[in-house]
Amino acid sequence: MTVAPGLKKAAVLCVLRHADAFLLLQRLKPPHQGLFTPVGGKLDPYESPQQAAFREVQEETGLQPLEMVWRGMLVETSPVDYNWISFVFEAHIERVPPPACSEGTLVWVEKAELAVVPTPLTDHFIYEYLLANRPFQFDATYDATLRPLVMREELQGLSLPLIS
């Protein structure tokens, strides 16, 4: 499905956890090539965000979580073709050996390592809020080179520090 330039694309981010460990994807392709991210992807036509979350986890990991809990939203805006509305879900899973994935390499990352593994700037805030069990509505604005300009948490009206 083609989306007109500048329109937001709907997607899901699926944070897979076992206690304080996160199963993250080191991405092979843009966006965020080489960075560690939750699994996820675009919503298919007529699909709810939760249905997309279950489907994306199954497609990218082969895993089938029993429950997928909505945790927040991430809206990303830029003057180029990088405009997303992402529904962020969390699933608690067994700590299994990382399965093969065509999108990149799946790796278990411990909570203490989250600050040092390369991730998109927005993801640090997602993990912080998840670990504190706080819902969120993040709004990130980028320039034409996709350098972050502004990051806000809209539920509390907070400007968040941009440290890259």
Predicted regions and their residues:
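Conserved N-terminal beta-strand and adjoining loop/helix that marks the start
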Residues: 1-23
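Short connector loops/turns at beta-strand edges and beta->alpha or beta->beta junctions
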Residues: 28-31
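A positional/architectural concept
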Residues: 33-35
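Unchanged
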Residues: 43-66, 76-130, 152-164
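Short, active-site-adjacent segments that bind or coordinate small-molecule cofactors and metal centers
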Residues: 130-151
